[in-house]
Regions:
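Short, flexible, glycine-rich and Lys/Arg-enriched loop motifs at helix boundaries
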Residues: 39, 169-190, 200-221
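Amphipathic alpha-helical recognition patches that constitute DNA-binding helices
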Residues: 12, 139, 167, 185, ...
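C-terminal substrate-binding subdomain of Rossmann-fold SDR/epimerase-dehydratase oxidoreductases
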Residues: 193, 199-322
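N-terminal Rossmann-like NAD(P)+-binding domain of SDR-like oxidoreductases, especially those catalyzing
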Residues: 1-174
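Short, flexible active-site loop motifs that bind/organize anionic cofactors or intermediates
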Residues: 8, 49, 72, 79, ...
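The catalytic Tyr-centered alpha-helix of NAD(P)H-dependent dehydrogenases
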Residues: 126, 137-144, 183-190, 222-226
Length: 322
């Protein structure tokens, strides 16, 4: 049985990755400091090590048990916070990742799937965004992710080290079977905030800008279901274990959904009216961010199963009313 270490495996995306790996009969160990990850997201079938990526000794001790691959999802990810406290993000994201890679090299673990982000691209210069799009992150968070990609690229040239950087677009939804119940704390993303309005936890949603060059005037984004993200991680591990090559791959649906379309979807699924208010544009918000997933299909043999926004919203609502 092939063994995978999932660093950050108690978090929102990480727990779905663990679930997908267990379903494919991998032996899984989760390494998480539970700063944002939650114990309720842990699976009894997976071993758990409570640890921080700053702890080089524990990382190396854990990896010395022998793993075929690492999935690295541990990171600080609040864009605003990264601009206010770049030193925290440099220390945690960049230095912490180097700690992981050094532990891999020192223990002979040769493959890593890295949780990167569409934020490395910055303002789109053309659409849909592909992997050759210019890199120009507009936040320190996005910068840290690209720096980590560059470190991996150099390690792959200098050491016996393979990587797949998966550049996520907007992750949404929850496990369709309801097996993962831990909600993200202090949500920053659109759908969880709309759900807080739907459940009465928040009075209203602010829609930033209705004068964009889009069909309804609100921003368009590419929303990808978290189970589709998880299945791509499994496909990436299998690809590296069989071919021993490195890749950088977008994970997206190639479909744009506007803010108003998301609100309307939640209203259809929940049967509840969403209270929202138009507000001025936020500085730096692009009107449209949509990516092609052609390369993911070609390299990983992967394509998203969730392409209907109502189906995605329903998996989130099912958790709210559980």
């Amino acid at each position: 049985m092939q063994k995978v270490l999932v660093i950050g495996g108690a978090g929102y995306i990480g727990s779905h990755v663990v679930k997908a790996l267990l379903a494919e009969k991998f032996a899984v160990t989760v390494y998480d400091n539970l700063s944002t990850g939650q114990e309720c997201n842990l699976f009894k079938e997976a071993e758990f090590v409570k640890g921080d990526i700053a702890d080089c000794e524990l990382l190396e001790k854990t990896m010395s048990k022998g793993f075929d691959a690492v999935v690295h999802l541990a990171a600080k990810k609040a864009v605003g916070e990264s601009m206010e406290n770049p030193q925290l993000y440099a220390r945690n994201n960049i230095n912490g990742s180097i700690n992981i890679f050094n532990a891999m090299v020192n223990t002979g673990v040769k493959n890593v799937v890295f949780s990167s982000t569409a934020a490395v691209y910055g303002m789109p210069q053309y659409l849909p965004i592909d992997e050759n799009h210019p890199i120009n992150p507009m936040s320190f968070y996005g910068f840290t992710k690209y720096e980590i990609e560059r470190v991996m690229d150099w390690y792959s040239r200098l050491k016996d080290f393979n990587y797949t950087a998966l550049r996520y677009f907007n992750a949404v939804g929850y496990a369709s079977d309801g097996s993962i119940t831990g909600r993200e704390k202090n949500p920053q993303n659109l759908l969880p905030i709309i759900m807080e309005v739907a459940t009465g936890k928040r009075e209203k949603l602010l829609v930033f800008g209705n004068d964009y060059d889009t069909p309804d005037g609100t921003c368009l984004r590419d929303y990808i279901h978290v189970e589709d993200l998880a299945s791509a991680h499994v496909a990436a591990i299998k690809k590296m274990l069989s071919e021993h090559k490195s890749y950088v791959i977008n994970l997206s649906t190639d479909i744009g959904t506007s803010v108003l379309e998301m609100i309307q979807s939640v209203e259809r699924v929940t049967g509840r009216k969403i209270n929202y208010e138009m507000a001025p544009r936020r500085a730096g918000d692009p009107s449209t961010v949509v990516a092609t997933n052609k390369y993911a299909k070609e390299i990983l043999g992967w394509s998203p199963k969730y392409t209907n926004i109502d189906e995605i919203v329903r998996t989130t609502w099912n958790l709210e009313v559980k």
